[in-house]
Amino acid sequence: MIRLPVLAAALAAASLATTTLARADEGDILVQAGHEGRPASCAILHVRACNLGASSADGTMERTWTVAVADEATRVLRAHGYSVVRRPADYDAHDTVKAAVFIHFDGSEPCASGASVGFPATTSRAFVDAWETSYRAFFPYRFVGENFTENEHRYYGFRKVDAPEKMLIEFGEMTCPAQFAWMKPRLTELGDKLAAFLMERVPK
């Protein structure tokens, strides 16, 4: 007889394998939750740099927040008739969409960072500016800039999708107690704002 915990673990592993080994897809928008599925997905896809993401002072993991925001944005977009390709951190596919967003929260020396964006040269200035204008008006803390690290500018996810608009979004620094306290009750709202931005910028 298979014990229930063992069966549950086996089903979870099978589900993860199905997600990470997904086929290439096409749609209107790709939404990736940063670090989702790690560390398990790193072993399946032989990822060497298995970055597990940031964590707050109370142990909250970045990958729980990215999933919450990504799932809410995906829910809203699909409810409005958009075709959404929803991806975790690691997956064996190359997708084609009109716009791709990659969701993250920063980790740093406490309160040394804030919100930021990363994007390749092919992303339009109008797309970046529209997000920055919207989010700066909402986020009451520091906006640290664009492509301010190589990991942002050359994010691996950009290579896994064909899209005219690609952008990594750092919503804020979860290692800063003030920013963490502000963002924690607003994860659903962050997903809603991201969906609203994408619906304004991406035609169905």
Model-derived regions: residue spans:
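Active-site-adjacent mobile loop/cap segments within catalytic or ligand-binding domains
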Residues: I29-L30, A100-A112, S116-G118, T149-K204
